Swiss-Prot record:
Organism: Trichodesmium erythraeum (strain IMS101)
Location of the active site: D79
The protein's enzyme class: hydrolase
Record-level GO BP terms: nucleotide metabolic process
Protein name, per record: Nucleoside triphosphate pyrophosphatase
Lineage: Bacteria, Bacillati, Cyanobacteriota, Cyanophyceae, Oscillatoriophycideae
Amino acid sequence: MKIPSVILASSSSARLRLLKTVGINPIVMPSNFDESTIKLKEPRQLVETLAQAKAETIANSIMKEKLPEKQSNLILGCDSVLVIEDQIYGKPNDKQEAITRWQKMRGQVGQLYTGHALIDLSQNKTIVLCRMTKVHFSHVNDQEIEAYVATEEPLKCAGCFAIDGIGGLFIEKIDGCHTNVIGLSLPLFRVMLNNLGYQVSNFW
């Protein structure tokens, strides 16, 4: 079996960094899919649907271009949301929303859902899976919240925090996959590759 290249259908620097950390250097092709068109209230279904839509947008673009060198590739799409008290949160729209969100999050336990969609163009197969990690937030004070939001890091992240950045200071612990919280569960990605007949070491 010819080993394809991996296309990351995301502009997330964190997801790109995770893949490079394990020896995979993907082609980055950010999806322009409009996430606001998907209205689902169940978080697992929401992130799986969005991840698949992002990957399919890139797949359709590749097939329309009829570029043979790309038509045997694997396309990875991901999407993450945080759930606190049955409320689904993505990226905050502005600093005030981020501050208000953190005032609700502090001292709480949230569920971080990341949907993963992997399309194998050569085999015409798609695998869609989700992983959930529990995140225990610290009892941070208003001054810490305002200072953190001023860095603008929370504005770039689903869930309003980056566990691999400054936000890691305010996370007591997690239950589950660490990289899932960053935006891509590496162990789950390995399983998805296996299900398509590949070994992760094929991509090193």
